[in-house]
Amino acid sequence: MRRFDSTLRLLVGLSLALAGCYGAYQIKPDEPRSMSGLTPNVEDKDAGMVAVAPGFDLKTYRVIAVNQFQVTDSNVKDDDDRRLAQSMSVFLQSELVRRLRESELFERVVNLTETPMPAGPPNALRIDGDIPRLGQGSQVARAFVGLYGGGRTRTQIEMRFVEVSTGKVVMLTADRRVASMGFFGGDSKDHLRESFDDAARDLAKFLLRLSRGEAPRP
């Protein structure tokens, strides 16, 4: 019995240690979409892959609005999948709004699900986007072989920064996140929420760097 208790404590301790070391993490995006002559193929340590239109100056925009993203993953097929997709899209939008407000880069950050776009705002940007990858993976597989990537959750976020006054796409980003470790594999929805929260946080960090004149960099 003592040996069993010791083994159980060791396994629990190892799982907790791994949970602390392995959360959601960023990997290379899968075939990000091009648009308006831009292709997100420049690596950035925070935003993933980006493409910035020539002459784009973030500091000239004082208002930014965030749309709800559409989940376009072909594996979303049944009602449970659709409910998950809807909840994660809402969560991502709220996290983007929160992180952008905390950054203090803009005078106003608008959640377009809650508030219409202000009429005629000067120098405004709108963030549109898609979630082309969204998968819960397998908690059982993560618990047993998560150290080797088995059963991992996955998500990919592709954003379009649109100049409101002209409709011109001025920047694209593509950010892919996966998670394969956690306490007894970790809850899939928790892993996905962590991925979206981290992506929103890191996008704000990228925009802060961009506003200081720094170029995207690995």
Language-model features: where?
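Bacterial N-terminal signal peptides that target proteins for export
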Residues: 1-11
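C-terminal motif of bacterial Sec signal peptides marking the signal peptidase cleavage site
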Residues: 18-20
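A structural "domain/chain start" motif
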Residues: 22-95, 175, 205-218
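Surface-exposed short loop/turn segments
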Residues: 24-33, 109-166, 181-186
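Extracytoplasmic/secreted envelope proteins and their assembly/folding machinery
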Residues: 89, 93, 97, 103, ...
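Sec-exported extracytoplasmic/periplasmic mature domains
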Residues: 96-105, 136, 179, 204, ...
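Surface-exposed patches in mature extracellular/periplasmic domains of secreted proteins
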Residues: 102-116, 214-215
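Short secondary-structure boundary motifs at beta->alpha junctions and helix caps
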Residues: 149-156, 162-209
